[in-house]
């Protein structure tokens, strides 16, 4: 079995690779886990992980430059697929960041947090949303195995996804209002938070993906 981590020059790639390989050991899987920017090699993989970090316009431009956008679209149709952070945002129709069109797997937009966010006590909240936050699982999913409700994951983002179809929302967090932070449809699962930075909970989720 082969698991490809898409390398288009945008993202915490080596940290993701290290975490997924650790998760593979925990899963007891005999799987080859590798970084690749080769569309053909990505297309031959059994599972695909799509990380991303940085500005969405730059990420989309890099994806198209390397000819990986079509490989991603093909993988979305029929392979277990895990999008992380901007890799998750790229799966939506459109982003307010740079007025950028996404890949359109999920209907909806990626929106920016308001500039004057305040908590219930009236204290101003910083944007980007950065640090640990609890995640509510709103539906059952195989990737939640052995992950308790309200587990904390690590976030770094100024934009969040707003799905058109509420049935695609698998998890939510609050900053300070609820926002979708996990979405899924068929063979595709995607998180706004960074699994590779989320310690044991992130490793468990990646292990569950490799077993999915």
Swiss-Prot record:
EC number, UniProt record: 4.3.2.10, 3.5.1.2
Protein name (Swiss-Prot/TrEMBL): Imidazole glycerol phosphate synthase subunit HisH
Keywords from the UniProt entry: Amino-acid biosynthesis, Cytoplasm, Glutamine amidotransferase, Histidine biosynthesis, Hydrolase, Lyase
Keyword Cytoplasm: yes
One biological process term in Gene Ontology: L-histidine biosynthetic process
NCBIfam families: IMP_synth_hisH
Compartments in which it is found: Cytoplasm
Reactions the enzyme catalyzes: 5-[(5-phospho-1-deoxy-D-ribulos-1-ylimino)methylamino]-1-(5-phospho-beta-D-ribosyl)imidazole-4-carboxamide + L-glutamine = D-erythro-1-(imidazol-4-yl)glycerol 3-phosphate + 5-amino-1-(5-phospho-beta-D-ribosyl)imidazole-4-carboxamide + L-glutamate + H(+); L-glutamine + H2O = L-glutamate + NH4(+)
GO molecular function: glutaminase activity; imidazoleglycerol-phosphate synthase activity; lyase activity
GO CC, one annotated term: cytoplasm
UniProt superkingdom: Bacteria
Biological or metabolic pathway of the protein: Amino-acid biosynthesis; L-histidine biosynthesis; L-histidine from 5-phospho-alpha-D-ribose 1-diphosphate: step 5/9
HAMAP family reported for this sequence: HisH
Residues in Glutamine amidotransferase type-1 domain copies: 2-212
Role this protein plays: IGPS catalyzes the conversion of PRFAR and glutamine to IGP, AICAR and glutamate. The HisH subunit catalyzes the hydrolysis of glutamine to glutamate and ammonia as part of the synthesis of IGP and AICAR. The resulting ammonia molecule is channeled to the active site of HisF.
Subunit structure: Heterodimer of HisH and HisF.
Gene3D superfamilies attached to this UniProt entry: 3.40.50.880
Primary location class: cytoplasm
Active site, renumbered: 85, 194, 196
């Amino acid at each position: 079995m082969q698991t490809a981590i898409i390398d288009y020059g945008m993202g915490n790639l080596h940290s993701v690779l290290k975490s997924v390989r650790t998760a593979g050991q925990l899963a007891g899987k005999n799987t080859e886990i590798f970084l690749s920017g080769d569309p053909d090699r990505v297309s031959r993989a059994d599972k695909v992980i799509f990380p991303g970090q940085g500005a969405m316009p730059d990420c989309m431009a890099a994806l198209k430059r390397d000819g990986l956008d079509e490989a991603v679209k093909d993988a979305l149709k029929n392979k277990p697929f895990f999008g992380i952070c901007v890799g998750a945002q790229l799966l939506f129709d459109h982003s307010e960041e740079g007025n950028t069109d996404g890949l359109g797997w999920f209907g909806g937009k990626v929106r920016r947090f308001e500039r004057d966010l305040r908590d219930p006590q009236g204290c101003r909240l910083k944007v980007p949303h950065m640090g640990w936050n609890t995640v509510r699982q709103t539906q059952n999913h195989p990737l939640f195995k052995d992950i308790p409700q309200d587990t904390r994951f690590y976030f770094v983002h100024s934009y969040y996804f707003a799905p058109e179809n509420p049935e695609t929302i698998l998890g939510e967090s609050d900053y300070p209002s609820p926002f979708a932070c996990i979405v899924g449809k068929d063979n595709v699962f995607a998180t706004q938070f960074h699994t590779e930075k989320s310690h044991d909970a992130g490793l468990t989720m990646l292990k569950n993906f490799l077993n999915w």
